[in-house]
Amino acid sequence: MLEKLKTSLINSPVIKRGEYNYFIHPISDGVPSIDPHMVEEIAEYILQITDIKKVDTILTIEAMGIPVANALSLKTGIPLTIVRKRPYFLEGEVELSQRTGYSKGALYINGLKKGDRVIIVDDVISTGGTLIALVKALKTIGVEIQDVISVIGRGTGYLQLKELGVEPKILVTIDVSEKGVEIKNVFGNE
């Protein structure tokens, strides 16, 4: 179960960004190259743990959620919408502010309306800042969130999503130290 993902996480290099232990991984960074078989493994697993028939749109955040979300879109035929980092000034565009552990900025939602049913697919949840801002914005629009799935989780940022009434599914939960990446949990093995 998610063997390619787990093995690649364990083998991920860790670098220091200030006091922060940052792991470098194809799913979260695109470095080294993204193994298409690993992406397929992840997409297949997501299809096992979510009711995709209740979804109108697969939603992801630019940039690193795109490979997995695109694989899901191709497998299901469900359209993919990408929350972008720049505005397009289209009618109905919604701007949201997000803050992560190491960055902040604006994101822009286009093409969603009240009553749309989405699954949110993201690469990593750590502080939860991006997903919290996105969930709040979607609720304001009136979009129905069917599921929130993060391929990788570290830290406790997901707890704030629970306070918003969203129970994220984190495929692989990790700890990161100077020594490397340690697998703490795989969704479904609780």
Curated annotation (Swiss-Prot):
Keywords: Cytoplasm, Glycosyltransferase, Purine salvage, Transferase
UniProt-listed GO biological process terms: IMP salvage; purine ribonucleoside salvage
Major place of residence: cytoplasm
Domain of life where this protein originates: Archaea
Signal peptide positions (record): none
CDD domains (UniProt xref): PRTases_typeI
Location relative to the cell: Cytoplasm
Pathway: Purine metabolism; IMP biosynthesis via salvage pathway; IMP from hypoxanthine: step 1/1
SUPFAM superfamilies the record matches: PRTase-like (SSF53271)
GO MF annotation list: guanine phosphoribosyltransferase activity; hypoxanthine phosphoribosyltransferase activity
InterPro entries: HGPRTase-like (IPR026597), PRibTrfase_dom (IPR000836), PRTase-like (IPR029057), Pur/Pyrimidine_PRTase (IPR050118)
Ion transport recorded as keyword: no
GO-annotated cellular components: cytoplasm
Catalytic activity from the UniProt record: IMP + diphosphate = hypoxanthine + 5-phospho-alpha-D-ribose 1-diphosphate; GMP + diphosphate = guanine + 5-phospho-alpha-D-ribose 1-diphosphate
Keyword presence, Cytoplasm: yes
EC numbers, comma separated: 2.4.2.8
Complexes and interactors: Homodimer.
Main function: Catalyzes a salvage reaction resulting in the formation of IMP that is energically less costly than de novo synthesis.
Family indicated by similarity: Belongs to the purine/pyrimidine phosphoribosyltransferase family. Archaeal HPRT subfamily.
Name under which the protein is recorded: Hypoxanthine/guanine phosphoribosyltransferase
Native source species: Methanosarcina barkeri (strain Fusaro / DSM 804)
Gene behind this protein: hpt
